[in-house]
Amino acid sequence: MDRIIDSAATREDEAIEVSIRPKRLADYLGQQPVREQMDIYIQATKARAEALDHVLIFGPPGLGKTTLSHVIAYELGVKLRVTSGPVIEKAGDLAALLTNLQPYDVLFIDEIHRLSPVVEEVLYPAMEDFQIDIMIGEGPAARSIKIDLPPFTLIGATTRTGLLTAPLRDRFGIVQRLEFYSPEDLARIVRRSAGILNIDCTTEGAAEIAQRARGTPRIANRLLRRVRDYAEVKADGQITIEVAQAAMQMLKVDQGGFDELDRRLLHTIVEYFDGGPVGIESLAASLSEERGTLEDVVEPYLIQQGFLVRTARGRMATDKAYQHLALQPRERVSAFTDPEDLF
């Protein structure tokens, strides 16, 4: 199901993001602790004329992991090579990428948790010693040779750090977690994007869009484009708070940034499972959605905003969820209660 507030990138998102992507850290809005730390690391690295330590960036989709990698490369004054874990199928694919790097270049691997074990084995010495071992020939005549690599920086991005192997995770000297954005930072991003795209958007209109963007710049920019469409057809082209609210009503995105799937999830837990706890498999089956979709796309924002909690026994709707759905909380067994205490 296509969702207007899905944080996964569409082709339209990717095309637009290239045009509005900031180049410098000064233009990278939000994520202040990350910006401040990376600014120090980059300045120190340039002063020493070294390659920046390898960087792992993780967090939910749409928060700017790819954008941050472009900014880092730009600030370092080096080239960025972009690829993804699923694309690197064989050790030879990775070797080809690494041997074509220039000194101090940045190699960005998105979805790095999806690298195969064979490819990871090649990556370890490349990260540690700037060397790779490759096999020449076949059968009894096969032999291993070492190839020296120029100093480089690997930036890995992932939405699922739990799927990274410990040896790979431990080889990153810099680890940055991207958090959901505040409405204020998102409003600044909306205003900046509107200026670049020549969209007439008031401060109040930008704030209304930001409030419903689930803390995610990609969603904020997508909503901005859809509200622009509405403003051009149903209004005079300017995005005011009234126009933004009317457009959101048409898109069925409420003030909390929830769409029908979010509301269905909360309603299902509340109405069919008495508020929980309920296991993720049962929940996915009830909603006819994949477990991974719920865990990676839907739940993170609901949990971060306090509408849902994960416990050892399953998911539970909070009192805040009941309030959002205009329902009265029910008496329910605590997820932390010892079953023997019930008798």
UniProtKB/Swiss-Prot annotation:
EC number annotated for this UniProt entry: 3.6.4.-
The protein's role, per its UniProt record: The RuvA-RuvB-RuvC complex processes Holliday junction (HJ) DNA during genetic recombination and DNA repair, while the RuvA-RuvB complex plays an important role in the rescue of blocked DNA replication forks via replication fork reversal (RFR). RuvA specifically binds to HJ cruciform DNA, conferring on it an open structure. The RuvB hexamer acts as an ATP-dependent pump, pulling dsDNA into and through the RuvAB complex. RuvB forms 2 homohexamers on either side of HJ DNA bound by 1 or 2 RuvA tetramers; 4 subunits per hexamer contact DNA at a time.
Species lineage: Bacteria, Pseudomonadati, Pseudomonadota, Gammaproteobacteria, Lysobacterales
SMART domains assigned to the protein according to its UniProt record, in alphabetical order: AAA (SM00382)
Keywords for this protein: ATP-binding, Cytoplasm, DNA damage, DNA recombination, DNA repair, DNA-binding, Hydrolase, Nucleotide-binding
SUPFAM superfamilies in the record: P-loop containing nucleoside triphosphate hydrolases, Winged helix' DNA-binding domain
Swiss-Prot/TrEMBL catalytic activity: ATP + H2O = ADP + phosphate + H(+)
Chain segments carrying region Large ATPase domain (RuvB-L): 1-181
Protein residues bound to ATP: I20, R21, G62, K65, T66, T67, E128, D129, F130, R171, Y181, R218
Renumbered residue ranges of the record's region Head domain (RuvB-H): 255-343
GO CC terms, sorted: cytoplasm; Holliday junction resolvase complex
Protein's name in the database: Holliday junction branch migration complex subunit RuvB
Region feature Small ATPAse domain (RuvB-S), mapped onto this chain: 182-252
A Pfam family recorded for this sequence: RuvB_N
UniProt-listed GO biological process terms: DNA recombination; DNA repair
Subcellular location: Cytoplasm
Subunit structure: Homohexamer. Forms an RuvA(8)-RuvB(12)-Holliday junction (HJ) complex. HJ DNA is sandwiched between 2 RuvA tetramers; dsDNA enters through RuvA and exits via RuvB. An RuvB hexamer assembles on each DNA strand where it exits the tetramer. Each RuvB hexamer is contacted by two RuvA subunits (via domain III) on 2 adjacent RuvB subunits; this complex drives branch migration. In the full resolvosome a probable DNA-RuvA(4)-RuvB(12)-RuvC(2) complex forms which resolves the HJ.
Native organism: Xylella fastidiosa (strain Temecula1 / ATCC 700964)
Domain of life, per lineage: Bacteria
Domain notes: Has 3 domains, the large (RuvB-L) and small ATPase (RuvB-S) domains and the C-terminal head (RuvB-H) domain. The head domain binds DNA, while the ATPase domains jointly bind ATP, ADP or are empty depending on the state of the subunit in the translocation cycle. During a single DNA translocation step the structure of each domain remains the same, but their relative positions change.
Binding site for Mg(2+): T66
Gene3D superfamilies attached to this UniProt entry: 1.10.8.60, P-loop containing nucleotide triphosphate hydrolases, Winged helix-like DNA-binding domain superfamily/Winged helix DNA-binding domain
Main location: cytoplasm
Binding site for DNA: R291, R310, R315
